[in-house]
């Protein structure tokens, strides 16, 4: 049953990531869909950390697997981010690649912290 929960969550997360991926062509070197997926995933995992820490006993263990491992794992994408950064670096756009790394890391960590602390205020 665990594998089904993870697989279903991953399918939903990947579908949302594919929809967000449609935003990628809107900016020359910042793939907005990938950035949006990672920042949204960071926000949601921060929230989920609090929910499952404070009220984890209220949820079936498969729900946590569905949300955190499945959905958020399917939504966020380190491999796509890595390939986009590599493409910039490989084409000589070193500064753009470094900026993209900084933007992803800073925004995603900030979103995770925001999700965590805002959810703690509500719980």
From Swiss-Prot:
Q: Which UniProt keywords apply?
A: Cell inner membrane, Cell membrane, Ion channel, Ion transport, Membrane, Metal-binding, Sodium, Transmembrane, Transmembrane helix, Transport
**A GO-annotated cellular component:** plasma membrane
Q: What species is given as this protein's source?
A: Psychrobacter sp. (strain PRwf-1)
Chief subcellular location equals membrane
Q: Which residues cross the membrane?
A: 1-21, 32-52, 66-86, 94-114
Cystine links in this protein are none
What role is this protein assigned? Fluoride-specific ion channel. Important for reducing fluoride concentration in the cell, thus reducing its toxicity.
- Stated regulation of activity: Na(+) is not transported, but it plays an essential structural role and its presence is essential for fluoride channel function.
Q: Which reaction does it catalyse?
A: fluoride(in) = fluoride(out)
**Pfam families attached to this UniProt entry:** CRCB (PF02537)
Per UniProt, subcellular location reads as: Cell inner membrane
Question: Is this entry keyworded Metal-binding?
Answer: yes
Q: How does it sit in the membrane?
A: Multi-pass membrane protein
User: Which HAMAP family is this protein grouped with?
Assistant: FluC
- Similarity section: Belongs to the fluoride channel Fluc/FEX (TC 1.A.43) family.
The record's section on NCBIfam families has: crcB
- Residues holding Na(+): 73, 76
Query: What GO annotations for molecular function exist for this entry?
Result: fluoride channel activity; metal ion binding
Q: Which GO terms describe its biological process?
A: cellular detoxification of fluoride
Report what the protein is called: Fluoride-specific ion channel FluC
